[in-house]
């Protein structure tokens, strides 16, 4: 007879054994689904393939309950993870007849060995049916993921807890009616369900899908967390505030139709209720994009030498300029790449600094979609970038190397120059986001080498933003949780300067190796907690980081075999810190004794942009994009205009950028959030406008010209008395799209004309046939409330001061390309600031004026005279001066006083506006200075009561103030 001794195979299964009746407890094996997920993620990322059996067996946690085998004679014991225990059990095992099949992965499965039974043998199994009972399972930790968490680490813990809960629910072994058809030991001597094994790919796919959903939601939570302190990109900007355009159709509220414009509450600006935005045409008025003249001289780039190539485009040499050609590619995480390159041009045009490269001209070729777009920008051209400079023979060790003292002096110059450029950006709330040696350019001026920051394509605004730039220069917070701030620029600057001194970055290597080095020398994850999965899940948090008081740069230098001066080492220790809040700023470093030598800044002078513009080509010809219409990106019109980004003290000077749909929006200015937002307002509060809050009502006579039926001015107690809410009931025939164009024109002139009433927010609404407009402005009073008969403190007649202001208003309009019309002198639209001196400054409400008088053409740049009361066919300047003179005399109870001070005959002799201002009695009159207006915090929305005012509907309005 054949030997029936049980044989043990390498996989731990017993062969040549009869199928036995297995009495098994109802406790199913507990599976560690995190290990399943980690293995599948590793396989997806190119790791070794894992089979279904090994996957489930390797992730199964032994259940301490005993398993009783029936008449087969197998030993009764607890399942163990130890192979030694299995061998001991096999030593005492009895003989068996029929082999138990060895289960393989699904792709290698063969038909299982079936047991032949006698026909008279009943097929009903005698063993109990397996039923998974939750009460007999190992206690499962259930995480409460519904509560609010205080830290990012709590959110991560909750996400992993939710993942564990979902995986346990989805991936439990499926019970089979009538019991398992076969039950056997699998790898590592654990119970394996063959049906579950066959269904494992489906289960794992379900696990993977669910994990991806949770991961996406978690990433969205992280994105939302960064957005909490990030300024939302609005659609249109104004003097002193921001327009956010909302439209309500009936009572339905729809989200903004603007990419990457999600409104999230934050400490910087509150969240408006999102409404459906009226679509506007690209390149509308105020976009700073103008079509160049036909037949302008052009340059063909096919003959231009190539300076470099990158993912976004190519840089050519055109004369003494660098021509950057960028294509509008939509990348992951970038909603509108072409808007970014246009923004770079507009940013460069407004950043005038000796250590930032000068922008010269910009051109845009735009088609029907964003991918059909090319942005061409001309910049001043330097010698080379800093990386190429440090690769020259005189910088590298060897016989041709320059003197070490000269080398260290040049490095100090470059350090200070780049710090000055970063200070200029950070003071304006801007992050460079891509500081590296390739983006620092070397110039010569008066025999001196000058370093300048370039490549502003990644430049961003706000307190925090998503990661951008080059990974080798990323700080730990960017590597771990994918955010950047101004302190991230300082880290990248430190890495760059380390590279200049040593020839290599301090934390070289791959992503994970680089992170390990960062944490090793600056403090961070405990080694037991650090793993690839944690990094992939952005699991870094301050609570889990053992931050070192001072980075261990000595150990880093010893390991890298480099030697640095003590002063430079101290600088590096102040910027290469794990906690961004502990890093020194550019302003802090510039106070260091290392940079006090004034000779370090010799040759640092602002480039004369006008001289570069004279030699720049009028147009760049792109033959491969002939089907795209060219447009020119226009800079500031006034050549003597100061850097608007530096105008901190004037509330009206708001720097501009271009959003995704090419409408300008203000750059984030941190001083507005700190100082200008009044503390007397409560954010996220409902404002109800009741009849008790009504200050004044102006019924408008119904004529064909007027588009407004009624004007109401509210001053609710929740608002400071320095602000008004204006409600305009519009005619049903009014065109919302025309009003949108009007507001885009108004925002452009509010930025540059101090005589326009600033509008902090406006909303257009419709309910049935009712149409309305609500906007928030500073409190104002009609000019008729002024006392024109008195005198100022210096004895000047008040009427003469008003007259000079009116003429100055006309001059300001003319300088901005607007034909001032005489019927703007109207009591309904001229106001003065009640918080200032008694006589002004005067303000013109362009919104009411345009809707009252210019409904046929709501383009403020196309105003034409419609006042036929003045029949003087003379010069428009004379008409304007005489109209203002007549208006002031009508408001004065003693008009002869004005005649004595400023005779009408003298005004009639004026042929230019300058002639009026040269009148001796007018020349000495001083106009009151414009006052700084604090922008209030945003209320969540504004509600009009009673609702029957708009035929039973409810009006909601909200906006962004900055």
Swiss-Prot record:
Active site: 434
Reaction(s) the record says it catalyses: L-seryl-[protein] + ATP = O-phospho-L-seryl-[protein] + ADP + H(+); L-threonyl-[protein] + ATP = O-phospho-L-threonyl-[protein] + ADP + H(+)
Acidic residues: bias regions: 81-90
Nucleus is among the record's keywords: no
Short name of any one Pfam family annotated for the protein: Pkinase
UniProt-annotated binding residues for ATP: 307-315, 324
Domain Protein kinase: 301-595
Keywords: ATP-binding, Kinase, Nucleotide-binding, Serine/threonine-protein kinase, Transferase
PROSITE patterns to which the protein is assigned, alphabetical: PROTEIN_KINASE_DOM, PROTEIN_KINASE_ST
Family recorded in the similarity comment: Belongs to the protein kinase superfamily. Ser/Thr protein kinase family.
Name of the molecule in the record: Protein kinase ORF73
Originating species: Ictalurid herpesvirus 1 (strain Auburn)
